Amino acid sequence: MPKAEAGASVTGLSESAYVAPDFLHTFPFDSSKIIFPKGEQKVQIEPECALIFQATWEGTKLTGLKPLCFGASNDCSIRKEGAKKISQKKNWGAASKGLSENLIPVDGFEEGCVLDDYRIASFLVRDGKVYVYGEDSAVRNYSYIYGQLIDWMLEKFNGQKDEGPAEDIHSYL
């Protein structure tokens, strides 16, 4: 799998073409560590199944997402006082999120595919003791999965408005 490089840019776009806040320009995933934000005390573990997609575009519209692989992820959040947007709670810099070093190829993205055989379970190690954290969940039982998940993602990427905690994601793409 290709890795994102620090300072990577999109071919043909000048730095001034980016409309996303500067803190979103930093690739947040790391497979070996999470660097906690300075001065923040309320970091929340969020175990997830991360999916890597190949995107299809028609002009500026995202029209398709093809799953390529998946792996365990820690989608950490900060319970940040005064944060108005989800991104302010979710992205605080390099190594702010965990992603498995070993990603598993997807053989399809519908009931009966390899994802049906996987579960997400999370454990916290503190003072040498292991604690169960959260629910042991079958990936196939996620509330949004397969076609429903892709449809929802395409709708959000293309049409979500900058309202309340949500942002106009399409303008960032």
Which residue ranges define each predicted feature?
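Conserved catalytic-core subdomain
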Residues: Y172-L173
